[in-house]
Amino acid sequence: MLRTRRTRQIGVIMPRLSSESCARMVEGISRVLDDQNYQLLLINTANDNTREVRALDTLRHDTVDGIILIATMFTPEHHAVLQSLHVPVVIVGQQYPGFSCVFHDDFGAAQAATAHMLQKGRRKPGYLGVTLLDKAVGLARREGFDSALRDAGLVPQPQRMSIAKFNMESGYHQAEQLFGRAPGLDCLFCATDSIALGALQYCRSHGLRVPDDIMIAAVGDNRIGRVAYVPLTSAHLHYRTAGDKAARLLMDMLADPHAEPQMIKLDYELKCRASTGDDNSDENVWSL
C-alpha cells in the first residue's frame, strides 16, 4: 500500500559520483523536480551493492515521497527491499519486472558501434566489457557485440574478450592482458567510454596507432572521449533525457498511485570519430 503523506522529497540513488553518465541523468531529474517544487535527496553508493540495498531500506522509512534508482545490477537483497517499499519507484538504466523503468537500447548501441568497424573491413575484433551480472552494460552490450560479429560472418572468440571495471585504469590493464593473449586484433569494442579511454592510452604507450593498427569504439559518448588525443567513436545515449523521463514518470505515479508500471526504451545515435577513421571536425563536442 502506498502512503499518502507528502514530504516533497525524492530520493535518487546513484552508483558513481565520478560518472558523467550518472551526472547527466541527475541533471535531467533535478530540472523536473525543481519545476515541481520537490527537493532531491542524493545518495551515492560507490558501486557497492550492499550500500545500494541499505540506501533503499533507509528511504523506505517515510523519508521521501518517491525513489529514482540508477541501477547497475540486482541481487536477491534488492528484490526483497524493492518489494517492501511503500513509495513509488522508477528504475533507470535497467529493466526490472513489476516496476516502471527508463532504459537504453544497449544491445543496439553495441551492435551498431561494432558493426561500424567491421563494415570498414576489420576482421579481428576484441571486446572489453563489464560483468554480465549487469544486464544492461554487461550482458546486453556483449550480446550486441556478438550479434554484429555473427552478422559479419565471424564467430565470437573468448580469448579476444576481457572483463574490466568501470574506469580508465581497469581499461588500460585489461587491454594489456587482452593484447597479450590475442595479438593482432584490428578493432576493439569497449562497453563504456571510460574503459575505451584506458585502452586508447594503452595503445598510445605501446606504439599501436589508432585507427591505423586498431580501431576503437564504445558506448556512452562522454565529452572526455570527444577530445581525447584520438577522438572516440561512441554510441550516444540520452542520459539527461533518461533522467527527465524518469522524474516525469515518478510525478505521474505520485498523481495516480494506481498507474500501471511503464517501460520506456530510449534510442541511441552513433557518433563516428577518428578512432574508427572518421572525420568529426564539424562536430560541437561540448553538446550533451
Residue ranges of predicted features:
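Periplasmic-binding protein-like
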Residues: 12, 63-71, 126-129, 161, ...
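Alpha-helical structural signal in soluble globular domains
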Residues: 28-32, 78-81, 85, 140-152, ...
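Flexible loop/turn connectors
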Residues: 176-177, 181-288
